């Protein structure tokens, strides 16, 4: 649709098909530019679309207006695995109703204020904000743990290298 809108959205292989505004909300209908997806089990590409069910997810606000993205949730059939899989998306976690960047934004806002305050500002329930906060916390904790263990492994390897290297 609009190259500037696509550039602002910053999602790979996605274009904005249409844009609508209603009350204080913006709705962007997205379309994927790629016709295939990678199977989650065998990692092979499949272009055999089984079904397409659009869903509505919330994204960061645009100019102070609540923003929703209507995205196609595509399910493909993999001939190698003989099974169906739902396309994974880089901008949202599986089973979530919000973009990753919106969830990260909410997580940061809660750290600066409180769940109650963010709940009022974003017009989401306390339970929703708390669930998003816990989800983001778990992701960050897992990521920090992986980074810590990778760092420890590197340090361990460096110590071994200095012990075995000739001086």
Identify the function of each model-found stretch.
Residues 116-132:
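Short, basic interhelical loop/turn and adjoining N-cap
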Residues 22, 112, 159-162:
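Short flexible coil/turn linkers enriched for glycine and charged/polar residues
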Residues 1-83, 88-89:
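Short, conserved DNA-binding cores of transcription-related domains
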Residues 37, 113-114:
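Residue-level signal for the short linker/turn that defines the boundary of a DNA-recognition helix
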Residues 133-167:
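RNase H-like nuclease fold core
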Residues 98-113:
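Short, amphipathic alpha-helical "recognition" segments used to contact nucleic acids or chromatin
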Residues 82-102:
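Short, Lys/Arg-enriched anionic-surface-contact patches
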Residues 44, 123, 134, 138:
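Residue-level detection of the helix-turn-helix DNA-binding "recognition helix"
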């Amino acid at each position: 649709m609009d190259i500037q809108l696509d550039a602002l959205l910053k999602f790979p292989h996605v274009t904005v098909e249409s844009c609508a505004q209603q009350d204080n909300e913006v709705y962007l209908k997205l379309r994927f530019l790629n016709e295939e997806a990678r199977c989650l089990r065998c990692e092979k590409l499949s272009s055999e679309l089984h079904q397409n069910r659009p869903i509505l997810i919330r994204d960061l606000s645009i100019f102070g207006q609540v923003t929703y993205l209507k995205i196609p949730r595509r399910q493909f059939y993999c001939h190698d695995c003989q099974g169906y899989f739902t396309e994974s998306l880089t901008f949202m976690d599986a089973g979530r109703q919000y973009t990753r960047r919106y969830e990260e934004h909410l997580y940061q806002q809660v750290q600066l204020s409180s769940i109650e305050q963010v709940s009022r500002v974003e017009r989401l329930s306390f339970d929703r904000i708390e669930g998003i906060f816990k989800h983001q916390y778990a992701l960050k904790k897992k990521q920090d743990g992986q980074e810590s263990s990778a760092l420890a492994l590197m340090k361990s390897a460096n110590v071994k290298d200095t012990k075995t290297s000739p001086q």
